[in-house]
Amino acid sequence: MRASPCISQPAASWHPRPSALRPTAGSGPDTRTPGTVEDGSAPCPAFRSPAVSPCGEEPCCFQISPAEETLELGRLVSPGNCDTLSPRAAGFYACHVRSLIPCRSTKGRWPLTASAAGLSSFSG
C-alpha cells in the first residue's frame, strides 16, 4: 500500500525523478520560476507550526515557515535545502525537485531544533 504525498498539491504534472533528488547547489545559473511546476518544481504552502501531517514513503516537500524555520515532516531541517519566494508576497514558498528527498533518508541527517534561533547559522 502506497502512502499519499505529503504535500496537498495536484500531482498531475509533478513527477520528481530519482536522479533529480540529489542536491544540485552550484550546478549552474538558476533559470527556474519559483512557485511553478516547470522543471520539476512545485509550490508548497508555508507551515505556520511544526504540526504537519506525517509522511509515508513518497518524496516530501521542505519549506520555510514565516518564522524562518525550515520544516519537513514536522521537524526542522537546514534552510539551505529550500528555494523561497517572498514570505509576505504570496504566503508560500517554492520547493524545487532538488529540495525533495525521500522521507526516510532525512532520518538522523539534519540538525533539529525547537526554534528558528538555532538555524541562524544557516542564513548565509
UniProtKB/Swiss-Prot annotation:
Coiled coil: none annotated. Keywords: Cytoplasm, Nucleus. The keyword Hydrolase does not apply. Its main location: cytoplasm. One of its GO terms (cellular component) is nucleus. Induction: By p53/TP53. It is found in: Cytoplasm; Nucleus. Residues 1-11 have a biased composition (Polar residues). Residues 1-42 are annotated as: Disordered. Strongly expressed in testis. Weakly expressed in heart, placenta and skeletal muscle. May play a significant role in p53/TP53-mediating signaling pathway. This is TP53-target gene 3 protein. It comes from Homo sapiens (Human). The gene is TP53TG3.
